[in-house]
Amino acid sequence: MREIVHIQGGQCGNQIGAKFWEVVSDEHGIDPTGTALGDSDLQLERINVYFNEATGSRYVPRAILMDLEPGTMDSVRSGPYGQIFRPDNFVFGQTGAGNNWAKGHYTEGAELIDSVLDVVRKEAESCDCLQGFQVCHSLGGGTGSGMGTLLISKIREEYPDRMMLTFSVVPSPKVSDTVVEPYNATLSVHQLVENADECMVLDNEALYDICFRTLKLTTPTFGDLNHLISAVMSGITCCLRFPGQLNADLRKLAVNLIPFPRLHFFMVGFTPLTSRGSQQYRALTVPELTQQMWDAKNMMCAADPRHGRYLTASALFRGRMSTKEVDEQMLNVQNKNSSYFVEWIPNNVKSSVCDIPPKGLKMSATFIGNSTAIQEMFKRVSEQFTAMFRRKAFLHWYTGEGMDEMEFTEAESNMNDLVSEYQQYQDASAEEEGEFGEEEEEN
């Protein structure tokens, strides 16, 4: 089967990951001890995408949990599904990375990385036909960003032909958790551009907005935010895990969404988002799902798709619905808002339909868009980076761990190149074919 090995790193990654395993276990009818209590055969038919069956038909997540300090892991272990993980798959150090990318990537993280890779190998070997890896991490801290990107590049070396999907929480525009976020994020993006296949970009502020505006939660907790993220994570792979009429997998997604190899940073969204109290009063239709799905307020990262154009997009529907209706709605969106789609990629929306909806809903949809507007986010981080780097603020923490200023300059220019690539394709039109083709060859 098409297995996916899940890796979570750092505090943010571990908290998102823990929530994700609650959601997936629930979907497959697995209780916190790993016993199957489901009422349907479909839940177990392809459960081995995310779970390994151990002795006594216990299901164990194919999850690897890593951190440079034991704190978050202890709280995962004492959480609702803490006992379901394989104890050997908790890999942690004692020192912590202290929000320092260099510690995660070069010093502390580098010492721990071999033990993580051993666990990765063990998990990969127990797979029948490994499809790829999914990594949860944040780009603002030290472990998730520094050690996370180190692990991604090591896995890339060892499994060059497997998909590498990341769920990356980027620093938010208004709320900052650490002062050195712009440094950590820029250094991480520098790595992700080269080594990841698909990056789902998330950020806390956009998630907070969804909780406030749409879900009407007055004081959203990180648990609420992580729940939104895990809905998307489960939606992306539901086609692998449940039978459907139009299937998608990580590789099909990549082929349909990535027109140019470096432009693999996606906005994601999930529908229906309704406040907890009003859920049962709404019957959903495909047009309603579609409308909410393309809504800018629904995007889980702080970039506005209306400020750019979609290169490609993918809609993953779940539930019993007619594929004809799905296709009509998708076509409808493209025809009505044609200026928001680049005209040199015709029919650039891929859709897939999976028959089994998530718990408690009749139908749902997950949206993944490759929009040039994501450059807003990179621009924002880059400006903050430049402001600090110009004065060499906080740089001694990084050079003290053996980093070179050169590396910062490289990361900065790589990020700026990425922004201008997005801009170039946003401005490109189908008529300029001649000069456009020539530009490409020079690069």
From Swiss-Prot:
InterPro entries: Beta-tubulin_BS (IPR013838), Beta_tubulin (IPR002453), Tub_FtsZ_C (IPR008280), Tubulin (IPR000217), Tubulin/FtsZ-like_C (IPR037103), Tubulin/FtsZ_2-layer-sand-dom (IPR018316), Tubulin/FtsZ_GTPase_sf (IPR036525), Tubulin_C (IPR023123)
GO MF term list: GTP binding; GTPase activity; metal ion binding; structural constituent of cytoskeleton
Record field: transmembrane: none
Residues that coordinate or bind GTP: Q11, E69, S138, G142, T143, G144, N204, N226
Compositionally skewed regions (Acidic residues) per UniProt: 429-443
Entry's Gene Ontology cellular component terms: cytoplasm; microtubule
Biological processes annotated in GO: microtubule-based process
Keyword Aminoacyl-tRNA synthetase part of the UniProt annotation: no
Pfam families registered for this protein in UniProt: Tubulin, Tubulin_C
Record: residues binding Mg(2+): E69
Taxonomy, superkingdom: Eukaryota
Compartmental location: Cytoplasm, Cytoskeleton
Main location: cytoplasm
Cofactor(s) demanded: Mg(2+)
UniProt xrefs under Gene3D superfamilies: Helix hairpin bin (1.10.287.600), Tubulin/FtsZ, C-terminal domain (3.30.1330.20), Tubulin/FtsZ, GTPase domain (3.40.50.1440)
Function of the molecule: Tubulin is the major constituent of microtubules, a cylinder consisting of laterally associated linear protofilaments composed of alpha- and beta-tubulin heterodimers. Microtubules grow by the addition of GTP-tubulin dimers to the microtubule end, where a stabilizing cap forms. Below the cap, tubulin dimers are in GDP-bound state, owing to GTPase activity of alpha-tubulin.
Protein family: Belongs to the tubulin family.
Subunit comment: Dimer of alpha and beta chains. A typical microtubule is a hollow water-filled tube with an outer diameter of 25 nm and an inner diameter of 15 nM. Alpha-beta heterodimers associate head-to-tail to form protofilaments running lengthwise along the microtubule wall with the beta-tubulin subunit facing the microtubule plus end conferring a structural polarity. Microtubules usually have 13 protofilaments but different protofilament numbers can be found in some organisms and specialized cells.
Extra facts: The sequences of the three genes coding for beta-tubulin are identical.
Entry protein name: Tubulin beta chain
Source species: Polytomella agilis
